[in-house]
């Protein structure tokens, strides 16, 4: 008798191969918490895409929209967005074609930010005054992973200092979290002078960002993965993990839904269409971790 996770019955859930999803979920359940790790994007994956019909800000947007950025800088950043975002999500261009454009976009944006005399002490205030929100169910998600010793690797092309501060202000920044992102580099007098390490953009979230390898080496028994993303570029986030046995890829389809649905369904095992919650992920975690929890299961 196949057991079904009831959260997968949600209207927002799309699956190209439900049978295959069932097999992967079964394997994850047999492995339990001891074998599991979660690898996730942040912006528009753990954070909300929209609330009450209004777009929510990404970690870059939070800074772009803040009062510590000059009007001229904001205008230039907006122009960059209107030029490059359509390229980022264009279904007719290959990732290889998009790559140089993404590097240009991030590099230009970071260069503009470095001209703004941004101070480290301003970050918490900027986040506190923003409209950033984590997805509904975030507390259950973060707390469940922490309580069950499941590592959460957040791989973000956003701004590490900002997203870390969001998680801290939401009071779910637990010790099981490891973040790789674009972290700000401040001068001795506390002003932003650049960004540390290799630039991370939408389409190089893979093992080429070499600082991940030692992290994954420590987790060699964590051979089962739940991967969460909202772009095609997020699909490579687990590429640096050695010895993967089972991986369940869950994609949030937030924007340009009609034109991107087929591509997402071909790429992700589970697609969540315009779903601003973590209900499905939390339901799966319950099913995997709490073997006796039959409330979440429906016999077929």
From Swiss-Prot:
Database matches in NCBIfam families: HAD-SF-IE
Enzyme active site: 41 (nucleophile), 43 (proton donor)
Keyword field contains Cytoplasm: yes
Recorded name of the encoding gene: Nt5c3b
Protein name: 7-methylguanosine phosphate-specific 5'-nucleotidase
Entry-linked Pfam families: UMPH-1 (PF05822)
PANTHER family named in the record: 5'-NUCLEOTIDASE, 7-METHYLGUANOSINE PHOSPHATE-SPECIFIC 5'-NUCLEOTIDASE
Binding residues annotated for substrate, in chain numbering: 156-157, 205
Compartment annotation: Cytoplasm
Residues where CMP binds: 88
One GO CC annotation: cytoplasm
Organism: Mus musculus (Mouse)
Binding site for Mg(2+): 41, 43, 230
EC nos: 3.1.3.91, 3.1.3.5
GO term, biological process aspect, one: nucleotide metabolic process
Primary role: Specifically hydrolyzes 7-methylguanosine monophosphate (m(7)GMP) to 7-methylguanosine and inorganic phosphate. The specific activity for m(7)GMP may protect cells against undesired salvage of m(7)GMP and its incorporation into nucleic acids. Also has weak activity for CMP. UMP and purine nucleotides are poor substrates.
Principal cellular location given in the protein's record: cytoplasm
Primary enzyme class: hydrolase
């Amino acid at each position: 008798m196949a057991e079904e996770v009831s959260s997968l019955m949600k209207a927002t859930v799309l699956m190209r191969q439900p049978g295959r999803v069932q097999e992967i979920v079964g394997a994850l359940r047999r492995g339990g918490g001891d074998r599991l790790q979660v690898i996730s994007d942040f912006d528009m994956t753990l954070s909300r895409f929209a609330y009450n019909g209004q777009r929510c800000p990404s970690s870059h947007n939070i800074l772009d929209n803040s009062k510590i950025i000059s009007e001229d800088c904001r205008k230039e950043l907006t122009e960059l967005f209107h030029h490059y975002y359509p390229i980022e999500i264009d279904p007719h261009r290959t990732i290889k074609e998009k790559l140089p454009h993404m590097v240009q976009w991030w590099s230009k944006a970071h260069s503009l930010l470095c001209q703004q005399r941004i101070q480290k002490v301003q970050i918490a205030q900027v986040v506190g005054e923003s409209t950033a929100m984590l997805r509904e169910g975030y507390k259950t998600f973060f707390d469940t992973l922490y309580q069950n010793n499941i590592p959460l690797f957040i791989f973000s092309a956003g701004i590490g200092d900002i997203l870390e501060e969001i998680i801290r202000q939401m009071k779910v920044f637990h010790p099981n979290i490891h973040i790789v992102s674009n972290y700000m580099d401040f001068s001795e007098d506390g002003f932003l002078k650049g960004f540390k390490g290799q630039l991370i953009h939408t389409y190089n979230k893979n093992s080429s960002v070499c600082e991940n390898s030692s992290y994954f080496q420590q987790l060699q028994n964590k051979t089962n993965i739940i991967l969460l993303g909202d772009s095609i570029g997020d699909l490579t986030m687990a590429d640096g993990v050695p010895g993967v046995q089972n991986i369940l890829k869950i994609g949030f389809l937030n924007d340009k839904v009609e034109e991107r649905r087929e591509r997402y369904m071909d790429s992700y095992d589970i697609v969540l269409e315009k779903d601003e919650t973590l209900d499905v992920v939390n339901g799966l975690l319950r099913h995997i971790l709490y073997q006796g929890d039959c409330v979440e299961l429906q016999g077929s």
